[in-house]
């Protein structure tokens, strides 16, 4: 069974990705503890060493770019959530210090001047991802099946196509020989092309799914492998490779600061590769969101975190049950509910409901073609109640088909099941909580209700807008606030831009401050603002 490891004291005011002005508070008779540490970043994607020597870090899901000072450890936000740049995936600098960012979900390339002014250079590059600047020339790749490799006109003219029909090219670099090197994820190879024209050539193949390449100061090609978790040094003339480090799946990009090599990971971890297989953690990883939560029959807490699925161990560490590139992974996970015997019902951002057995590396899709799925709950009959936010519906998914239980809802997000089998749903767009089949509303006047759980005839709702946990009795329907100033939702004054998704890896993404209850009535909360998981208990 999971247990809390960090009491809620001043330590909740952690200098992470979320600006904390007030520590969380709870009503009398309750205690709040933190189970996982806050995350410093919203994951870590593209890396680039800036002209000031800092390491710039793109964070797709956070719509944020941060800069890390290696000498002090200081982490500054350069482009914040809710700002002009949306879902940045890779970065490059020109000779004047302008920062170019690919916005993978919006198909854009934007330019941020040293004074902070930002403008869109192009908005017609689907799955814009890899980017590099070389001798006044800007190159961009589309990370999709049938993607193109482009040279962009810095004045906004039509791009020049270097290559077409590429199977998902990614983060690229011009080598000492003047050729443009780029990983091709769909081919599991690294290619190169003359930027002045020519046919792509394969440099190395049979890799661990390369997703980024850079050159070290000695002219060696270095590449991260997203599937195998290896960092390889490759001879660009022969294709021979050496393993510099074996880390974990989910590596994303790399950068050199002088002779020092740093790599990024989906988890937000930044690792320095020291040579001879040794590594050093520069920034620790953490949860990217988190999203849905579920407690199994053994009392273990499972966490859906988009590209990862975790179980929280008793010592507070996270054990990976599966991730985007592991066998049987259903896809970008959002909602989760325990089914028993190591099996879970999950919803994905690709519009699928699946039964997932992480320890067997198996999954089975039971419904597909749905629009922005969020919470899932299991009825006593075995049916799965699912919130379909995009269609404004709650669905019942059974082996014999899918039935619409309610329609015309305003952004349904969270679902839970009462002891007598009724479905409770939160409507984030209407600020209310409804029990399906009832004539009235269970709770209204909320700002943005998301996660919902039922325990001991109490309905617990996370209001991510008000940053509160509200409880309402199913009988009296009297509400009361249990916790406030919770690290959920967006910071005050920030309106996040929509994350449209990046097929085939994910559909539209969005926050989900979930809540679930354990067998001992402990409440677990997805603190999606600071990237932690909290536990709320009644005092004995």
Predicted features along the sequence, with ranges:
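Short loop/turn segments immediately following the C-termini of beta-strands
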Residues: 60, 104, 143-144, 185, ...
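Blade-level signature of beta-propeller repeat domains, shared across WD40, Kelch, NHL, RCC1
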Residues: 506-540
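Beta-rich, blade/repeat-based domains predominating
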Residues: 6, 38-52, 82-99, 108, ...
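Short loop/turn segments that connect beta-strands within beta-propeller blades
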Residues: 69-73, 112-117, 152-157, 193-198, ...
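Beta-propeller fold detector
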Residues: 34, 76-80, 119-123, 160-164, ...
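Sequence/structural signature of beta-propeller modules
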Residues: 1-29, 539-540
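A short helix->beta-strand "capping" segment at the edge of beta-propeller domains
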Residues: 18-40, 496-502
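Beta-strand-rich domains and repeat architectures in extracellular enzymes and scaffolds
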Residues: 34-64, 527-532
């Amino acid at each position: 069974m999971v247990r809390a490891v960090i009491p809620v004291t001043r330590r909740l005011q952690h200098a992470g990705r979320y600006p904390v002005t007030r520590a969380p508070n709870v009503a009398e008779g309750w205690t709040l503890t933190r189970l996982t540490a806050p995350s410093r970043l919203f994951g870590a994607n593209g890396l680039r060493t800036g002209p000031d020597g800092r390491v710039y870090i793109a964070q797709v899901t956070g719509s944020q770019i941060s800069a890390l000072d290696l000498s002090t450890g200081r982490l500054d936000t350069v482009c914040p959530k809710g700002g002009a740049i949306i879902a940045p995936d890779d970065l490059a600098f020109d000779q004047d210090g302008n920062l170019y960012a690919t916005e993978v979900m919006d198909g854009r390339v934007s330019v941020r001047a040293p004074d902070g002014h930002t403008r869109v250079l192009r908005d017609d590059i689907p799955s814009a991802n890899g980017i590099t600047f070389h001798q006044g020339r800007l190159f961009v790749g589309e990370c999709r099946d049938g993607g193109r490799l482009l040279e962009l006109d810095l004045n906004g003219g039509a791009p020049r196509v270097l290559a077409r029909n590429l199977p998902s090219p990614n983060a690229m670099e011009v080598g000492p020989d003047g050729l443009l090197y780029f990983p091709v994820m769909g081919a599991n190879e690294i290619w190169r092309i003359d930027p002045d024209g020519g046919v792509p050539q394969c440099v190395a193949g049979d890799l661990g799914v390369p997703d980024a390449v850079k050159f070290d100061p000695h002219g060696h090609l270095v590449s991260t492998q997203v599937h195998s978790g290896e960092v390889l040094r490759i001879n660009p003339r022969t294709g021979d490779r050496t393993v510099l480090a074996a880390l974990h799946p989910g590596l994303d990009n790399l950068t050199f600061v002088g002779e020092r090599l740093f790599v990024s990971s989906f988890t937000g971890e930044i690792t320095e590769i020291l040579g001879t297989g040794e590594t050093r953690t520069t920034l620790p990883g953490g949860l990217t969101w988190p999203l849905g939560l579920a407690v199994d029959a053994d009392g273990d807490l499972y966490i859906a975190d988009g590209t990862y699925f975790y179980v929280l161990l008793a010592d507070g560490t996270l054990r990976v049950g599966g991730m985007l590139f592991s066998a049987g992974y259903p896809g970008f996970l959002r909602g989760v509910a325990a089914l028993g015997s190591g099996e879970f019902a999950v919803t994905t951002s690709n519009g699928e409901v699946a039964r997932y057995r992480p320890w067997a590396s198996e999954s089975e899709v039971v419904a597909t073609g749905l629009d922005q799925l969020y919470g899932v709950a299991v009825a006593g009959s075995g049916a799965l109640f699912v919130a379909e936010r995009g269609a404004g519906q709650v669905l019942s998914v059974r082996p014999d088909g899918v039935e619409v239980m309610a329609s015309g809802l305003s952004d349904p997000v969270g679902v839970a099941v009462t002891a007598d089998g009724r479905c409770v749903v939160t409507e984030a767009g209407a600020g209310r909580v409804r029990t399906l089949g009832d004539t009235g509303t269970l709770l209204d006047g909320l700002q943005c209700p998301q996660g919902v759980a039922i325990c001991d005839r109490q309905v617990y709702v996370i209001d991510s807008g008000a940053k509160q946990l509200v409880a309402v009795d199913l009988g009296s329907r009297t509400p009361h606030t249990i916790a406030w100033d919770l690290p959920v939702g967006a910071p005050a004054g920030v309106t996040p831009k929509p994350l449209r998704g990046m097929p085939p890896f994910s559909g539209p993404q969005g926050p989900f401050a979930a809540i679930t209850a354990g067998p001992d009535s402990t409440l677990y909360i997805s603190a999606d603002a600071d990237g932690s998981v909290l536990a709320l208990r009644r005092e004995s």
